[in-house]
Every structure is written in structure tokens, then in C-alpha cells.
Amino acid sequence: GRSHGIHAEPMSFGLKIALWHEEIKRHIERVDQVINISSVGMISGPVGTHATVPIEIEETVCKELGLKPAPITNQIIQRDRHADVLQRLALIATSLEKFSIEIRSLQRTEINEIQEPFGKPGFVSTGSSSMPHKRNPELTERICGISRVIRSNSYAALENMPLWNERDISHSSAERIIIPDSFLAADYIINTFYKVISGMKVNEENMLKNLNLTGGLIFSEKIMLSLVEKGVQRKDAYEAIQSASIESMDKGIDFKDVIKNNDMIKKNLNDLEVELLFDTEYFLKYVDQIFKRLELS
């Protein structure tokens, strides 16, 4: 795992994907909600009084169309409903951008833990027009770019909510662009992301290799907490582990060796105890329970 772009503690790649899965489930729930909110119709006359159009006509027409009559309107259905729809699309697009940024980040040459599909039928087969060796994450970059457009459109939908009196048509010209464009763009990036995730290559060897890049520094918190359990003040334990970490990084010495030769740590942890602390499985002990809670196992 990484936080602030820096190695944090071990986790499984499956947990990362499960996090995305749960977020997508929330989007599906939101779509169901907004369908209910937005599936309304109205035929209520120039200012919403029904003076020239009886309510019964509105109810009959809406029923035929599978809509609910809006309880009250002026000349139009209020644009908070439209804005809500586009906000939900923007949320979906932004999640796909978030997932895509992660894929792009993990595809970088020096990380190379996953790769989006490349060279297969229906996928990109040219990374760079001038550098033949490149496999650029073009599909996920495209998702990120289009997501920005959908978010911008959702802001325009908010701008369409305040209108003069019982209606003006300043919203109309914008809606002719932002509503169809947002749905088309969302459909495109959803399908593109499905293609990416379905054909994505996972490089397990590089994941393990990168896990060991820091020479064991990823176990720092576990060692610190073990010292605290031995009665060392947390502040003192933190400073000792931080000092050992800096020495390991600056001198290129394996973190475990630095720990074993630190006087304060040696007083509290013997070599066998230190060895047992450098265990990646410790960090994964609740993974199965998390998946069960997500109903994925």
C-alpha cells in the first residue's frame, strides 16, 4: 500500500479492487434513487396553475408515459431534478477517474505492477508515435479527461437551477448540450473502464519486488507497537524506529539489521522476536473477513 505516494504497509491488490467494487455498488444505489426523483412529468399551463389544463389530463398523460405527476410546478419542472441527475453522472465519472489514476500510477515504468490492455484486438497497439517501446495508459488517460467534461457539465446544471420568476429559457440552450453529452460521455467511459478492468494485466512478481524495495521499512509501525507493548513510551519508541529508518535509508542498510543493532530496541526485543515482526501475512489476517463483510466470498 501507498499513502502520499510513499510505501505504507502491506495490503492485497484484491482489497484495492474490492474498494472500487463497493464504491460502484453505491453508485448503482444512487442511480436507482435519482431515477425515482427525476421520473416526473407536468402539463400544468403557463405558470403551473392548471387553469387551462385540468389536473386529470396531466395525470392521464403521465401514467401513459410511466411518470409521476410533479406535485407542483411553474412553467417547467424544477431544474434541481436535472441537476441531481448530472451530479450522479459526475460522481460516477469521478470514481472512474479515481480508479483510472490508480491504474496509470501503478503502470509507471518504475512500478509496473499492472498494465491496461495493449495490443489485443480492439485495444490500443501504439504507445507513442516516436518511441516504439512505450505502452502508454491511453485508455485510462482518456477516462480521466472525459470525466472532467462530465464534472463541468454538472456544474452547468447547477447554474440552470435559478431562473427568473416562473421561467426564462437561459437553461434550455445549455441543457441541449450538457444532458445528451453527459450521458454519451458517461456511457463511453463506463464501457471503456469495463474493457480496461476485464483485460488488465496484473504483475504479481513486481508487486512482491516492490514490497521489498525499502528493505523492510514497511514494518516500522508493527515494530514500534511491539516496543510499546513491552512498556516503552510511544514517543520514545517512535523516535527510535524513526532514527533506525533514517539510518537504513541513508546508508542503504537492511532495516532488520539496523533494528537488531539498535541498543534501545535490543533491550526490549530479541532477535527471534524481531524476525517474527517482519511478516507480511500479519497485515493480511483480516482480508477474508473484509471480503465476507462485502459479500464477495
Where are these regions (language model features)?
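Glycine-rich cofactor/substrate-binding loops
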Residues: S129-S297
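Internal glycine-rich alpha/beta core junctions
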Residues: E9-L163
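Short, conserved phosphate-binding/catalytic loop or strand-edge motifs used
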Residues: G1-A8
